[in-house]
Amino acid sequence: MSILITRPSPAGEALVSRLRALGQVAWSFPLIEFVAGRELPTLADRLATLTENDLVFALSQHAVAFAHAQLQRDGRNWPVAPRYFAIGRTTALALHTVSGFDIRYPLDREISEALLQLPELQNIAGKRALILRGNGGRELLGETLTARGAEVSFCECYQRCAKHYDGAEEAMRWHTRGVTTLVVTSGEMLQRLWSLTPQWYREHWLLRCRLLVVSERLAHLARELGWQDIKVADNADNDALLRALQ
C-alpha cells in the first residue's frame, strides 16, 4: 500500500514522516496553501470590544496561527474577557498555547455540528460571536449561532489558495508509484483532486483508490464523485488519520 497525503503543510509532511517511521510508503501532495487573510489588520480592535458575555470561535489551527502572529505584530495580547471555543482538540490546544486560556471544544468530532451541541452554546441570545476562519468554508456555525440570537461576525484570518500542478504529470507520477490510498481532509481538496486528474487516470487509477476522509459529509461527496472504497476517520487530526491507516 502506497499512501498519498493531500493535506496542507506542515500537517501533511508530519503525517508522512510518522507513516514512514512505521514502515509505510507515503508521499505528501498538498493541494492548497495558506496566506494571510485580508481582515487580519482589524482583528486586535475587534477582539478588544468583546466583553465577558461574548464568544470567540477558532475554526482551525491556521486561523489561530495567523491571528496570533497579527496580534504580536500589533503588540497586543489575546483579551481575557470573552469565552473561547475551538472546532476540536488540536485547534483548542493551539489556541491555549498562545493565549494561556481555557478553551471549550467538542470531545467527539472536529465538526461544526459537534461544536454546536456544547451546553454553553444553547442559550446565547444577545451575545456577540466573533468567528476566526479562512475564506470560504461552511456557513453552518454562523447561521446556527445567528438563529439562536447571537450577533455574529467573521474575521478572515487566512486565505486558502490552490497550489498549481500539471494534472497529467502528477497523475502519472502517483499512478507509477503505485499509490492505492488517498487521504483527503476537506471537500475543497477532494474536488480539487478530482478535477486536477485527467479522465483516463481518474477512471483507471484515482477512483479505484481507497479513500480516507474525515466526515460523513465528505464521504457522501466522494460517493457522488465516483469513489466506492471510502473510510471515515474518527477525527480530523493526524493521530486519528494514523489510526485509520493502520
Curated annotation (Swiss-Prot):
Keyword Membrane: no
Pathway given in the UniProt record: Porphyrin-containing compound metabolism; protoporphyrin-IX biosynthesis; coproporphyrinogen-III from 5-aminolevulinate: step 3/4
EC code(s) of this entry: 4.2.1.75
Superkingdom of origin: Bacteria
GO terms of biological process kind: protoporphyrinogen IX biosynthetic process; uroporphyrinogen III biosynthetic process
Reaction it catalyzes: hydroxymethylbilane = uroporphyrinogen III + H2O
Gene3D superfamilies: 3.40.50.10090
Keyword Lyase part of the UniProt annotation: yes
A Pfam family the protein falls into: HEM4
InterPro entries, per database record: 4pyrrol_syn_uPrphyn_synt_sf, 4pyrrol_synth_uPrphyn_synth, UROS/Hem4
Any one Gene Ontology molecular-function term assigned to this protein's record: uroporphyrinogen-III synthase activity
Alphabetic keyword roster: Lyase, Porphyrin biosynthesis
Role, per record: Catalyzes cyclization of the linear tetrapyrrole, hydroxymethylbilane, to the macrocyclic uroporphyrinogen III.
Subunit organization: Monomer.
Family of this protein: Belongs to the uroporphyrinogen-III synthase family.
NCBIfam families xrefs: PRK05928.1-1
Name of the featured protein: Uroporphyrinogen-III synthase
Species: Salmonella typhimurium (strain LT2 / SGSC1412 / ATCC 700720)
Lineage: Bacteria, Pseudomonadati, Pseudomonadota, Gammaproteobacteria, Enterobacterales
